[in-house]
Amino acid sequence: METIMVINGPNLNRLGKREPDIYGRETLSDLHERLIKFAEARGYKADCRQSNHEGDIIDWIHEAEGRSSGVILNPGAFTHYSYAIRDAIASISVPVIEVHLSNVHARESFRHTSVTAPVTKGQIVGLGVIGYELAMLALLEGEKK
């Protein structure tokens, strides 16, 4: 069974508690369960992970090469300044789609810049947890080609 790796960055372990008016009331566990079921219904496996540590995220991106069909990445605040994560994405041939629960472009100005987006297949923002499902559909559709 093909695998889609889902990587969530810093503070996403606080989903459901942290600013629910912005990020929603679903917990990270809820999100992971939802994505696992979503993938299984399409004959795929979702490998869901979260870390508050940049090095873990980099290691997982590297691990995706040759192990996963694609990566859904919510780098959290690392989006705006982690050239190390950007370079990790650029170093693999596996497609990566960047996802953000909130519309980062409608928030504080520091959130408007993504150093990671230019090396991803695409970016989905502001659609809540459905954004992850749309990213998965895009990766699965890309697999068919």
From Swiss-Prot:
Active-site residues (renumbered): Y23 (proton acceptor), H100 (proton donor)
Record's keyword terms, sorted: Amino-acid biosynthesis, Aromatic amino acid biosynthesis, Lyase
EC primary class: lyase
Pathway of action: Metabolic intermediate biosynthesis; chorismate biosynthesis; chorismate from D-erythrose 4-phosphate and phosphoenolpyruvate: step 3/7
Molecular-function GO term, any one: 3-dehydroquinate dehydratase activity
GO biological process: amino acid biosynthetic process; aromatic amino acid family biosynthetic process; chorismate biosynthetic process; quinate catabolic process
CDD domains linked to this entry: DHQase_II
EC number: 4.2.1.10
Family: Belongs to the type-II 3-dehydroquinase family.
Subunit record text: Homododecamer.
Functional note: Catalyzes a trans-dehydration via an enolate intermediate.
Protein name in UniProt: 3-dehydroquinate dehydratase
Naturally occurring in which organism (per UniProt): Halalkalibacterium halodurans (strain ATCC BAA-125 / DSM 18197 / FERM 7344 / JCM 9153 / C-125)
Highest classification ranks of the organism: Bacteria, Bacillati, Bacillota, Bacilli, Bacillales
